[in-house]
Structures are given as C-alpha cells and as structure tokens.
C-alpha cells in the first residue's frame, strides 16, 4: 500500500466550498502519478509513449464526509491486476490520518492498449513491477 498526503486547496472546492467529485478523482490521479514517480517511472515518457497507453476506463467515488479547503488528507492506494492488460486502484481518503474520519472511497480501472490499433495489450513490465511494489505489506509514504 502507498500513502499520499495532500492538503485541500481553494481551487479544489466548488461554489459550495467542498471538493467536487471530479476534483476528488483528479486528486486520486495525482496520488497515482506520485506512486509512479516513487517507483522511478518517468512520467513524461510514460504518458507520451507511442507504443502504449493506459487510459482509465472506469471511475467511481463515494463520499462519506465533505472535504473543505485547508483540510489535510491521507490517501491510501491499493492496486490489483485484473487481467494481463488491466488493473484497478482503490483509494481510501481520510481526513487528517487513517485514524481520522474516512471521507471517501474511490476506484479507477485502467486498461493497457496500443494507441494506434486501440486494441488491448499486455501491461509493460514496469507496470507489473509497480503493481507488485504498491501491494507490499509495508506502507510507502508519498508527499
């Protein structure tokens, strides 16, 4: 499991002063990107690879508590490989720390494809290694 720390910023909130669902999913994606960087994956090369793309094909989020500007978040990421071309990431979002209130739970599902043919392809070795690393019992903390 990886743990990502984040502060809710004013720009993350809507007119009602709370984090909007699309923004919460964006924060989850930010945590995903940080976990890739922690695994020494070059994000520029990863997201611009002409041989492969790994788009999100499904996303969901459930809120249990509102998130307000200035609140500190602790986001737990746990990923699992579903197929040789597919994985999902579960995010648990806590206010303050995991001992605090659970504010939300999100899920994103990703599929590896060839960007030209748009056909599924096997996850690259670096992603299989990332999946193994993120699922170790020892937590890695990301800031």
UniProtKB/Swiss-Prot annotation:
It is an enzyme of class 3 (hydrolase). InterPro entries: 4-hydroxybenzoyl-CoA_TE, DHNA_CoA_hydrolase, HotDog_dom_sf. Keywords: Hydrolase. The active site is at residue 14. Pathway: Cofactor biosynthesis; phylloquinone biosynthesis; Quinol/quinone metabolism; 1,4-dihydroxy-2-naphthoate biosynthesis; 1,4-dihydroxy-2-naphthoate from chorismate: step 7/7. Belongs to the 4-hydroxybenzoyl-CoA thioesterase family. DHNA-CoA hydrolase subfamily. This is 1,4-dihydroxy-2-naphthoyl-CoA hydrolase. It comes from Gloeothece citriformis (strain PCC 7424) (Cyanothece sp. (strain PCC 7424)).
